[in-house]
């Protein structure tokens, strides 16, 4: 089974390969700079848009495209950054720029620590149609970055039941509790049907 990943984010590619125990091909290796307009109103809609766009562009009925749309939501900030997590500080912004924009938004509001959650929506496009699964991780965000591990908003997110940020936790712990890991476990069940 040829599995194409609808991402060029190196951190996400590595994480998905490790969790799925399979090699994936980043879509840009096959399609270059294919334009994908993520104009959905939810993580699920954006994951479907990415998976379907890439699957259709490949023209290979035997290919399987896995797309993930994920992000962090902070209810007290009106659910920011939500579906805009990857471009919170602007289109083309780095993980660090997005992280510090959220930290600064908390500081502007005088918030040191508040509930937040990560969502991962995964869409799988194949000759069988499109399947979707979700995973969530609950916790809190803090107004500072702690730790060097992980990527994205990890240095400011403390998962429920822990006193360290994802940026401070060992990779194995993060993998066992993450929103993406939960969604990928469900995605594996779908993929096993086709083996």
UniProtKB/Swiss-Prot annotation:
InterPro entries attached to this UniProt entry: dITP/XTP_pyrophosphatase (IPR020922), ITPase-like_fam (IPR029001), RdgB/HAM1 (IPR002637)
Gene3D superfamilies membership: 3.90.950.10
Residues that hold substrate according to the record: 7-12, 70, 151-154, 174, 179-180
Active site annotation, chain numbering: 69
Alphabetical keyword list: Hydrolase, Magnesium, Metal-binding, Nucleotide metabolism, Nucleotide-binding
Enzyme Commission identifier(s): 3.6.1.66
GO biological process, any: purine nucleoside triphosphate catabolic process
Cofactor note: Binds 1 Mg(2+) ion per subunit.
UniProt-listed SUPFAM superfamilies: ITPase-like
Keyword Transport included in the entry's annotation: no
Cofactors named for this entry: Mg(2+)
Binding residues for Mg(2+): 69
GO molecular function annotations of the record: dITP diphosphatase activity; ITP diphosphatase activity; metal ion binding; nucleotide binding; ribonucleoside triphosphate phosphatase activity; XTP diphosphatase activity
Catalytic activity of the protein: XTP + H2O = XMP + diphosphate + H(+); dITP + H2O = dIMP + diphosphate + H(+); ITP + H2O = IMP + diphosphate + H(+)
GO terms for cellular component: cytosol
Family recorded in the similarity comment: Belongs to the HAM1 NTPase family.
Subunit structure, as described in the record: Homodimer.
Record function comment: Pyrophosphatase that catalyzes the hydrolysis of nucleoside triphosphates to their monophosphate derivatives, with a high preference for the non-canonical purine nucleotides XTP (xanthosine triphosphate), dITP (deoxyinosine triphosphate) and ITP. Seems to function as a house-cleaning enzyme that removes non-canonical purine nucleotides from the nucleotide pool, thus preventing their incorporation into DNA/RNA and avoiding chromosomal lesions.
Protein name as catalogued: dITP/XTP pyrophosphatase
Organism: Nitratiruptor sp. (strain SB155-2)
